[in-house]
Swiss-Prot record:
GO terms for biological process: cytoplasmic translation. This is Large ribosomal subunit protein uL6. Belongs to the universal ribosomal protein uL6 family. Gene3D superfamilies: Ribosomal protein L6, alpha-beta domain. One of its GO terms (molecular function) is structural constituent of ribosome. It comes from Prochlorococcus marinus (strain MIT 9313).
Amino acid sequence: MSRIGKNPIPIPDKVAVTLDGLAVSVKGPKGELSRTLPEGVSVSQVENTIVVTPTSQKRKSRERHGLCRSLVANMVEGVSKGYTRKLELIGVGSRAQVKGKKLVVSAGFSHPVEMDPPEGVTFAVENNTNVTVSGADKELVGNEAAKIRAIRPPEPYKGKGIRYEGERILRKAGKSGKK
């Protein structure tokens, strides 16, 4: 049995969970999320907790046990607290701003890069160099943050580019020159 999967998921007070077979819907103050879980697990609600159990002891079912428990736990936490991912723009001329809902990033190209947020994700910019991606769906927030970072990933010589807050970049020494 999965060590992660056997832990029950507590349901906070302001969160409502609806189970319909393998379809799980979670509604809370930060929004509403729904997901259909893969075959091999069963989901049940016991008092104020959600319990995920494997339907058999086959390898696939045991593999999916911990995964499904984590997916449901992330949904519950997302609609109650939400998720945020922060990025930093480093380098001369690197700026970001929000126009309407769009994020406009100037990262040293000849043109600014515009990004539309998907449903349920919002962008916020502090002092033109710090971008915050927030939303209820952990997967969507992480994907959008990765797309922003991919515009100009940090380079190893001077560290310029877009990086996650607190991310360490392995630095390389430049050319040593001829002696």
